[in-house]
Amino acid sequence: MKRVLALIFMMVLAVSFSSCADSSQDVEVVPRLNEDVQTDEASLMPDTEKETEEQSMTEHYTTNTKIEDVINDPVFGDYGRLIFPVDSGYYGGSTLGNLSLTWYNYIDSDKTVEICNYMRNQAENGDTIFYDIYTEEEKAADPAKKDTGLFFFKGNPGTKFAIVNAGGGFAYVGAMHDSFPHALELSKMGYNAFALIYRPGAQTACEDLSRAIAFISRHTDELQVD
C-alpha cells in the first residue's frame, strides 16, 4: 500500500513539474509575440495617421466659437451652411461647445471642435472637402437639391472608400454627431470616407445616396479612391 501511495505521489510531482515547465515556456513566448505585433502595427500605420501625429492641427475654432461663425466662414464658401442642419429648428445652442441636436444625446463638444478645425485646415490648404452631386441645372429645377452634397474626409490615395449616412428621423441630417465623426476616424485609418448630406425623406434620401454612389464611381481617378 505504501509503495502504491509513493508511486502516485511521484506521478503527481512529475505532472506538476511538467506543467511548470510548459507555463514558463508560454511566458517567454508572449513578449516575443507582443513585440512582433507592435512592429507590424507600426509598419501598417496609414500614412495619413503618421502625418497627423507629426503635424499639429491649427486650432482655428474652440468650444467658445459661435456656430454661425463656422457656417459663415469664407473658407467654406456656400457649403458652410451644410455643416450643420439646414433647418436650424433641429439644433440648439449658440457655440460649438453647447451644440445640441434633436433626438441625440451625449454630443462630444471636443469632437465637434476637432471636426470643424479639420475641415477648415483642409479647405485652407486647398484641398476640396465638399462635392456637389447634382448639376446647377438640376438644382435650379429642384431647389431642394441645393441642400445635398458629399463632405470628403481624405485617406490614403487609392484606398477603399465608404459613404457614411447620418440619421435624423428623415426630418434632418445630424451629420455633426452621426456621420462626420465616423468619417474622420475612417480617414485616420487610411480609408477615404464621404459623409452624405441628403434631402430628408425616405425616397429622396435613397435617391441622393444613389446619386452619390454614381458620382464617386464616375470620379474615382480624380478623387483617388478605389
Residue ranges and their predicted role:
Residues D142-K154, K160-F161:
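A short loop-to-beta-strand scaffold at the N-terminal edge of the catalytic core in hydrolase folds
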Residues G168, I197-G201:
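Short beta-to-alpha linker loops that shape the active-site pocket of alpha/beta-hydrolase fold enzymes
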Residues R3-D22:
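Sec-dependent N-terminal signal peptides of Gram-positive bacterial secreted proteins and lipoproteins
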Residues F215-D226:
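Gly/Ser-rich "nucleophile elbow"/oxyanion-hole loop immediately N-terminal to the catalytic nucleophile
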